[in-house]
């Protein structure tokens, strides 16, 4: 496996505009996300961004940066388009897509996303962690993954994703963490697929891959990162990252 890690980032955000450059102890949030990615030691780091000011911040933090026109439908498309510029000869066969609003993600959590790709039949790896309580289970902003880990297994096929508390009945439920490891061929295929019926219904783009017959497997971790989407989240990140 030859992985590269790419962070999609854009200034436009409904609840927290400009969040890639939001100040956390004198440095932009994107720099802190790059710190966590560097600590994970997965491979080279790059930022796929929509604006030059994000690119400047990424380069100042020691990463490559590619400005991608803001006409792409998703962060995944932004990552794939950036890879054409970063690696036109496809020397890297795995692309890790890390959201730019995870400044507190643990390095070991990030490294775990590669584990599903040890199975050559898996196209896309992702992460899940235990759902904490019924409030989280019934909150539609927390995406759930239907997967069944046998025994002490740390990886399981991801059978479905939903905003509802699936699966029904007694047993563990899993919160999906939006970090992905794509085989390069799977990433290139994914962006050519039209939006699928279940994707549009659930508003979850990973369902496009499942509906197209691609195999997604999830690695389980104990603790998921929180995404910075509001000013309250930003204050929490500042507290956790206080020097």
Predicted region positions:
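Hydrophobic/aromatic residues located in beta-strands of well-ordered beta-sheets
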Residues: 5, 45-47, 95, 125, ...
